[in-house]
From Swiss-Prot:
Transmembrane segments: none annotated. Coiled coil: none annotated. It comes from the Archaea. Keywords: Chromosome, Cytoplasm, DNA-binding. Binds and compact DNA (95 to 150 base pairs) to form nucleosome-like structures that contain positive DNA supercoils. Increases the resistance of DNA to thermal denaturation (in vitro). The lineage of its organism: Archaea, Methanobacteriati, Methanobacteriota, Thermococci, Thermococcales. InterPro entries: Archaeal_histone_HMF, CBFA_NFYB_domain, Histone-fold, HmfB-like. It holds the Pfam family CBFD_NFYB_HMF. This is Archaeal histone B. Belongs to the archaeal histone HMF family. Residues 20-22, 54-57 are annotated as: Interaction with DNA. GO terms for cellular component: chromosome; cytoplasm. GO terms for molecular function: DNA binding; protein heterodimerization activity.
Length: 67
């Protein structure tokens, strides 16, 4: 884990209204976002395979997010 850069996550927290963000807070949110993204991506891969494709399409991602 730990592949998401901290700076963009820090900016997201600030967009939500925070004036200051600890590095640890940004790291924890980044880890959670990465876990959620991997979960969605795995569902999308399964959907693409089920459709007989190797390529994950935008529809797969959208369906994976909804499920």
């Amino acid at each position: 884990m730990g592949e998401l850069p901290i700076a963009p996550v820090d900016r997201l927290i600030r967009k939500a209204g925070a004036q200051r963000v600890s590095e640890q807070a940004a790291k924890v949110l980044a880890e959670h976002l990465e876990e959620k993204a991997i979960e969605i991506a795995k569902k999308a891969v399964d959907l693409a395979k089920h459709a007989g494709r190797k390529t994950v399409k935008v529809e797969d991602i959208k369906l994976a997010i909804k499920s």
